[in-house]
Curated annotation (Swiss-Prot):
Mg(2+) 2 binds at residues 286, 288. Keywords: ATP-binding, Cell shape, Cell wall biogenesis/degradation, Cytoplasm, Ligase, Magnesium, Manganese, Metal-binding, Nucleotide-binding, Peptidoglycan synthesis. It catalyses: 2 D-alanine + ATP = D-alanyl-D-alanine + ADP + phosphate + H(+). This is D-alanine--D-alanine ligase. The gene is ddl. It is found in: Cytoplasm. It comes from Flavobacterium johnsoniae (strain ATCC 17061 / DSM 2064 / JCM 8514 / BCRC 14874 / CCUG 350202 / NBRC 14942 / NCIMB 11054 / UW101).
Length: 323
């Protein structure tokens, strides 16, 4: 029996979703192969939480825990932290330094994909289309006329490094820009302002499954709100249709684009890429490397449509990281 540390929580606004994802992994872990340990990672504490919710501190020197005088070490870490420090390369670098296998991509890919601006800049030379964008760092002069001239209206103002659609605003007039920029700055000190793409939004899961890169069935997202925001993602304010209602030819095109991004970046583990399809062309918005793993989340939905159970999905991720 291998000891698997399931890390969850984190330092960002996404910690509540991460705790749900981590508990789903814990629930569906194959108990005939693995001993699962829920590890909560917060700024103020790293702790193992047992079945009675008792907490035991993690020794950060080797990521072990001592319970009733017995030192427990782990064979592998299953990373379920959305946002920092689990999705931006910090935990990946730490585990690499101490020689502990973990289920997500390496630290460089994690840091790169967490930064929307840098990710899209790296992928553009490979023919992957993106929205027109304008970048701001906190403290920069805000020239609203210049922004509108470049990206047009409506547009989206986003934190450069944040997930679950926290801090994102759809802006319909130049006068709304300063407020939207302030909202985004609450999540990150870098922001990205993108042109509005009027098309079909889809989400594409790509995983390494049993040694082969596999594109999962594509999900079409129809939001009741202006865009696929936090409410739409987690509070039922959207329709998520898997497989997407797009042609076979377009399904192949979008899948190949997502797969190319995965391969170009030398990814490992899970990835979920978001696209808007305009005039039969997919435009990439972002890539998530620790996508939601709640039972309602897109990757579990897509895996189910592909005939892959949650237990099998999680076993595959662990076995690949141990290989």
């Amino acid at each position: 029996m291998k000891n698997i540390a399931i890390i969850m929580g984190g330092y960002s606004s996404e910690y509540k979703i991460s705790l749900i994802s981590g508990n789903v992994v814990y629930q569906y872990l194959d108990k005939t192969k693995y001993n699962g340990f829920r590890i909560h990672i917060f700024k103020e504490k790293w702790v193992y939480v047992d079945a009675n919710d008792a907490e035991f501190p993690i020794d950060r020197n080797d990521f072990s825990v001592t319970v009733n005088g017995e030192k427990i070490t782990f064979d592998c870490v299953f990373n379920a932290i959305h946002g920092t420090p689990g999705e931006d390369g910090l935990m990946q670098a730490y585990f690499e330094l101490i020689g502990l296998p973990q289920s997500s991509c390496d630290y460089y890919q994690s840091a790169l994909t967490f930064n929307k601006r840098d990710l899209l800049s790296v992928l553009k030379p490979y023919g992957i289309k993106t929205a027109i964008s304008y970048y701001l760092n906190k403290g920069d002069e805000i020239n609203t006329a210049e922004i509108v001239k470049k990206v047009g209206l409506p547009c989206f103002v986003k934190p450069n490094k944040a997930g679950s659609s926290f801090g994102i605003s759809k802006v319909k007039s130049e006068a709304e820009l300063p407020i939207a920029i302030e909202v985004a700055y609450k999540e990150d000190n870098e922001i990205i302002i993108e042109s509005f793409l009027d098309g079909t939004e889809v989400s594409v899961g790509v995983i390494n499954y049993k040694g082969e890169i596999k594109v999962l069935p594509i999900t079409e997202i129809v939001s009741d709100n202006d865009f696929f925001d936090y409410e739409a993602k987690y509070e039922g304010k959207s329709q998520e249709i898997t497989p997407a209602r797009i042609s076979d030819e377009l399904t192949q095109k979008v899948g190949e684009t997502a797969k190319r991004a995965y391969e170009v970046l030398k990814m490992k583990g899970f990835s979920r890429s978001e696209f808007i399809i305009v005039d039969n062309e997919p435009y990439m918005l972002e890539m998530n490397t620790i996508p939601g793993l709640t039972t309602e989340s897109l990757i579990p939905q897509q895996a189910k449509a592909a005939g892959i159970s949650l237990e099998d999905l999680f076993t595959n991720a662990i076995e690949l990281s141990l290989a």
